[in-house]
Amino acid sequence: MDKFDQFVNDLQERIFDEAREAYGEKGFDRWRNPRFNGRLASADSMARVTGDCGDSIEIYLKIANGRIEDAAYVTDGCGTSSICGSFAAELAIGRDLEAVTDIDGETVLNAIGRLPEEDRHCADLAAAALQEALSRYMQRWASGKGPSEP
């Protein structure tokens, strides 16, 4: 390996070490291997929320028999927004709709384990997008424009 390749490898390892320190192992793994990323073509509800930082997170929900059957997210934001969107989607899958209403930024943060103080707002943003998608679904259902059962 030449000096340049060694420099690049060393730099990459330092970046990974810093990310592990900042996000913990679960957050680091999700940063490197995002899950539930992408749009659900057959989503029953979707919401896009933009935070004060300028990042946006979209949450997509597939709902059947009163439960979140599938969820996904898309973000135009930073790596922390991606981590938080991924965990918010994961937390929703398999839960009944009432249980999903309890998912907030603290729930997302607890699932990740830790985030830098300056990035914690991303957990709130992901939870807000999830709650907005659920709210839109419930509003359509209550108005008779959605499925016969939530």
What are these regions (language model features)?
Residues 55-66:
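Short beta-strand elements
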Residues 80-98:
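Alpha-helical support elements that line or immediately flank enzyme active sites
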Residues 45-49, 74:
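Short, solvent-exposed loop/turn elements at beta->coil junctions and helix N-caps
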Residues 75-83, 122:
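Short, thiol/selenol-centered motifs that function as redox-active sites or metal-ligating centers
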Residues 1-41, 46, 64, 95-150:
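C-terminal binding/interaction regions
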Residues 67-76, 113:
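Immediate flanking context of iron-sulfur cluster ligation sites
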Residues 40, 50-54:
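A short catalytic or substrate-binding loop motif that flags glycine-/basic-rich loops and adjacent residues
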